[in-house]
Amino acid sequence: MVPGEEPARELMAVLLTPRFRRLVSQNELPGPGLNGPSSRNRRDGFCRKRRTGCSGPFQATQLWDGIIHSLQAQVEIKRRRHHLQTYKDCFTGSDAVDVVLSHLMQNTCLSSNDISCLKGVHLCQVLMNHKVFEPVGMKKLFKKEKELEFEDSNISLYRFLGNKSSYDCCKRQKDAENEFNETLRPGYEMISNPLAQEIGEERIEELIHTINGNPALCPNITVQKPFLRLSKEDVWKEQTLLCLLQLIHLPFLDNILEPPVKTQNLQLNKEEDLVITNTCLDRELIPSLCLPEK
């Protein structure tokens, strides 16, 4: 290879593809250097790589796989807008042509002076016909209509098909992880206090019974009765009354042990209904009234 041929190739690539984004420099390419004894070793290694890497019955398969892989890895995939509609995971036709031409320039088996933008467009057309990617926003109305043509422009949008896109694979893995986390999330996030839950349920049942006018609560609910503190005298009275009731079954024994104040009040209440008469006063008033005697 002539020492001045490599810069000429780079200049030709820039002139042919004005949108050229990435082109490996001469030091990064696996080709030979300009001068020096080390250039022979590089040249020998380069020739060996050319013989082994691009020869054999699987040469075409390796070339196509390399083009598709570089297209999937280097093309810019993002959300884009076209004809008042938004499409996800799309790339432009001009970006695809730039990536394909960059791969052709860097590949030692395919690099030649005949590489042009038109060949890059034809190569993208072949990839689209073989369902590597599909156009977005363009559909065939009739079966007899010709195949859609690939357009080298910033307006035409395309999207990868199947599992060939590494971007789609990463996205599907993330979606699967998110779904797995969502299925496990409720079990980890739900924290309950059984004691507080039981108290809340009891209060709700109490409220429902009071609203329905049914004071009787469910048998599962236990309500503590108010505790009355009794004096020693009251306790002795109750015990004595119980012993008497066991011996003599009379109902009037209930009021025997009550204090005298209460009995007096009861007697006064009973005496209010009685009529008190004065016999002396009656004897004096009856003759004066001249009432007929019976």
Swiss-Prot record:
Gene3D superfamilies: Winged helix-like DNA-binding domain superfamily/Winged helix DNA-binding domain (1.10.10.10). InterPro entries: DEP_dom (IPR000591), WH-like_DNA-bd_sf (IPR036388), WH_DNA-bd_sf (IPR036390). It comes from the Eukaryota. PROSITE patterns: DEP. Residues 71-162 form the DEP domain. SMART domains: DEP. It holds the Pfam family DEP. GO terms for biological process: intracellular signal transduction. This is DEP domain-containing protein 4. The lineage of its organism: Eukaryota, Metazoa, Chordata, Craniata, Vertebrata.
